[in-house]
């Protein structure tokens, strides 16, 4: 018999708030976390706007020595993990640590560290790069450091599926508990690659918005959209087997009931134009949850703000939900946070859990010009109340990776 899996802790670091409560309260009122880049001089950069995390101090959770030895994406992950763990109320001394695992994703890992050490090697010699270069930059280090911090000694893995990474991480952790391999999992994602190399790489492939107006840069589903805005941050969830959580008197924030994954198997970066790949993962998630499409009331869309993605995701929703697609409330919180790449699915999972808890769909800010090719029931500029037990969060990534998660209100 498959076991139930619930959420007992959430943590977040995002461009619209440090801490999950701060982030959610700001999301509800449509706070924009997108502004001009401050982390490097953009004079020679075509793209000058991003969703930076402002006011983050890693020394709130670690000493100065550890902060110097740890990449920014890992710092974000550790902060979010600590928040989620504290909220869960878990006492590791009372747990079988081999039944507590970690699955925390990152799409790119410590890219700013790689850039910095490459420049150092070019200037001096490569024997003089930092001895911490490799351990601080590798993508799995956020997961490893969380395991160390929390004392979780079970499975510790890192999913890398581009912008679907965090959703795949949560989905894998969900199945791992449901199928009996673990009782507790810390899962989610972390990303921080707002640097010359990161911005330049995505800019050169015409993926980023080159708008010079922060309020019109990340505009998912708007007819004038012209690319995504890079964001940074982390979202971490503590998942637990239902009876395990009830036995210790944990507060349950929500339930994970479905996960679907598919691949377009079509192109390195472009989604299938007919939306069939993304539709497949939504359908698989619905089937995994054992519910009907009409039972879902809200979708936190992938909604990046690129011309192809939003058009394709619209088609996918229509394929997966049929007539019910006309009734579904849909928003893209990337309009506020920017696109956190491998961490986006985790931040958006937190948003979806909070949306279900409060029965409130956050807005898609900056939405002005409707697009006939994106004719879904978008929540434009203001949030909307809804009444539904179930909500979905979608993530789609380069390489054709598609992931959908379904959460249930408790």
Residue ranges and their predicted role:
Residues 1-66, 243-252, 350-364, 408-410:
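ACP-dependent fatty acid/polyketide chain-elongation machinery
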Residues 4-8, 31-36, 213-289, 297-298:
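Condensing-enzyme catalytic core mediating Claisen C-C bond formation in acyl metabolism
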Residues 7, 22-23, 31-161, 190-199, ...:
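Conserved beta-ketoacyl condensing-enzyme motif
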Residues 9, 27, 81, 102, ...:
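Conserved small-residue
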Residues 123-130, 171, 175, 192-247, ...:
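Glycine-/small-residue-rich "gating" segment that lines the acyl/pantetheine channel
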Residues 266-275, 304-321, 340-347, 380:
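Short glycine/threonine-rich loop-to-helix capping motif typified by GTGT followed
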